[in-house]
C-alpha cells in the first residue's frame, strides 16, 4: 500500500509539474507566437479587408469612456434597426443581410463590446451592464426607440436589453438562441445542454481556444453552416477576431458571475411586452434542434415563431435572403 501511495504521489507530482509547465511556460510562448502570426496575417490581408470596409459606412464613437465601432446602411433619417452579432462574429455577420433589409430604415450593426474595433478596456461583462452600455450607445446617437435584431450570443445581450428597457423597443427579432427556459434548470443541466458554457467557465481555456482565431473560426463555422464557408468571409472574421485583446475579454461573457438566464431566456418567453417578438430559427442547427421549440405555441404565447430553411447556426450567412425577408415582414407588420 505504501508503495502504491508513493507511486500515486509521484504521478500526481509529475502531472502538477506538467500542468504548471503548460500554463506558465508553453501557453505564454504559444500566445506570443500566435500574436506575431496574426499580426502578419492582418498585414497580408489589409487591402482586401479595407476593400470590404469601403462597401459600408464605418463609424467609431466613444460613449462614457467606451469605444464603439459600428456600420450604417439605409436611410439615416429612418426608423432604426439595431443588429447584434454572436460568437465568434462582429458587425460583418450581417454583411449579406443588411443590403436586403428595407433601405428606408436606418440599419446599425455594431461590433459588440470586446469584439473587433469596439472597447476592450472595460472589465465588467455582466449581461445587464453590457445591455445598458449598448443602450447608452443608441442614446448617444440620438436614438430613443428602435428595433433589435440579434443572433446567437448577441441574442443573450439583446434579450436582456429589451427585458430591462422595453420602453425603448419597437420590436425584437431574436435568432439562434433558446427560447424556453427548461423547468428546474440548474447550472449542471444548463452545462449539459450547452457544454461550451462549461468549457468557457475557465477563462484560461476560453482565451486559449480563441487565441488561435483561424482555428477557432474554422472549427465553429464549418460545422454549423449548410453552405460553403467562403474564404473572404473567413479571412475578414479572422482579421477582426485576431485583434489584440479580443480573445482575452470575450470569454468574460461566459463566466457565471455575469449571467442572468431568466432575463436572457425565461422573460422573453413569458412576458407580454408592449412590442412584438419574433423567434427566427434555423431548421438544421444541431445545437438547437426543432424539438426544443416544440412548446413555443403553448408556453410562449406572445412570441411568433418562424423557421429559416436549409440553414444552420449561421443562418445569416447560409440564407441571408430568407433572414432579411423575415425581418422585413416583421417590421412592416409592426408599424
Predicted regions and their residues:
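Catalytic histidine-centered segment of alpha/beta-hydrolase-like enzymes
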Residues: 311-320, 324
Amino acid at each position: 500500500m505504501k508503495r502504491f501511495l508513493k507511486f500515486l504521489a509521484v504521478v500526481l507530482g509529475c502531472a502538477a509539474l506538467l500542468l504548471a509547465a503548460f500554463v506558465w511556460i508553453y501557453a505564454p510562448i504559444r500566445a506570443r507566437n500566435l500574436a506575431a502570426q496574426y499580426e502578419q496575417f492582418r498585414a497580408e490581408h489589409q487591402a482586401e479587408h479595407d476593400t470590404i470596409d469601403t462597401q459600408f459606412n464605418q463609424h467609431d464613437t466613444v460613449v462614457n469612456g467606451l469605444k464603439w465601432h459600428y456600420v450604417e446602411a439605409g436611410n439615416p433619417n429612418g426608423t432604426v434597426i439595431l443588429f447584434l452579432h454572436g460568437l465568434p462574429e462582429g458587425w460583418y455577420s450581417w454583411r449579406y443581410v443588411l443590403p436586403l433589409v428595407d433601405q428606408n430604415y436606418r440599419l446599425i450593426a455594431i461590433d459588440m463590446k470586446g469584439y473587433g474595433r469596439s472597447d476592450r478596456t472595460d472589465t465588467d461583462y455582466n449581461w445587464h451592464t453590457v445591455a445598458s452600455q449598448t443602450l447608452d450607445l443608441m442614446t448617444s446617437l440620438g436614438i430613443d426607440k428602435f428595433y433589435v435584431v440579434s443572433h446567437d450570443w448577441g441574442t443573450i445581450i439583446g434579450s436582456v436589453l429589451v427585458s430591462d428597457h422595453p420602453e425603448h423597443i419597437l420590436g425584437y427579432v431574436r435568432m439562434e438562441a433558446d427560447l424556453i427556459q427548461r423547468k428546474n434548470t440548474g447550472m449542471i443541466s444548463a452545462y449539459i445542454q450547452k457544454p461550451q458554457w462549461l468549457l468557457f467557465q475557465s477563462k484560461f481555456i476560453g482565451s486559449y481556444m480563441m487565441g488561435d482565431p483561424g482555428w477557432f473560426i474554422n472549427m465553429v463555422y464549418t460545422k454549423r453552416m449548410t453552405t460553403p464557408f467562403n474564404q473572404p468571409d473567413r479571412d475578414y472574421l479572422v482579421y477582426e477576431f485576431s485583434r489584440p485583446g479580443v480573445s482575452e475579454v470575450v470569454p468574460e461573457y461566459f463566466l457565471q458571475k455575469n449571467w442572468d438566464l431568466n432575463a436572457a431566456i425565461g422573460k422573453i418567453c413569458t412576458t407580454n411586452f408592449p412590442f412584438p417578438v419574433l423567434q427566427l430559427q434555423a431548421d438544421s442547427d444541431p445545437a438547437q434542434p426543432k424539438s426544443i421549440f416544440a412548446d413555443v405555441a403553448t408556453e410562449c404565447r406572445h412570441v411568433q415563431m418562424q423557421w429559416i430553411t436549409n440553414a444552420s447556426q449561421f443562418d445569416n450567412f447560409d440564407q441571408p435572403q430568407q433572414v432579411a425577408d423575415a425581418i422585413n415582414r416583421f417590421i412592416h407588420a409592426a408599424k
